[in-house]
Amino acid sequence: MKIAWGSEVEEKLREMLADTPASYRKYLDPDVRACAELHAHRMGKSEVDEDAMIRGFITTIPRHLRDGIHEVLGVHNIDLQYYMPVFDEANPLDHNHTHVS
């Protein structure tokens, strides 16, 4: 599934990944994009918006590393309270831990 990305959302993702080491970013970027597109699809959206992108960003990061995401989201003025439930979600690309709905 390929869902369109708005230019503002693309830029926001680049900004959020900017502090990630390049060696990790090259793997993280495509996974975040795939997760964001999946979240957008599940929400019935035809384009990845900021909400779907942030959900994809959070769920792509392994759970044991998600504490560091709070700082990244805070720097980019993203409402942490709104996204707190997302921190408990599994990575939708990790088929070993997801259930078919």
Predicted regions and their residues:
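Non-catalytic accessory segments flanking P-loop/AAA+ NTPase cores
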Residues: 1-101
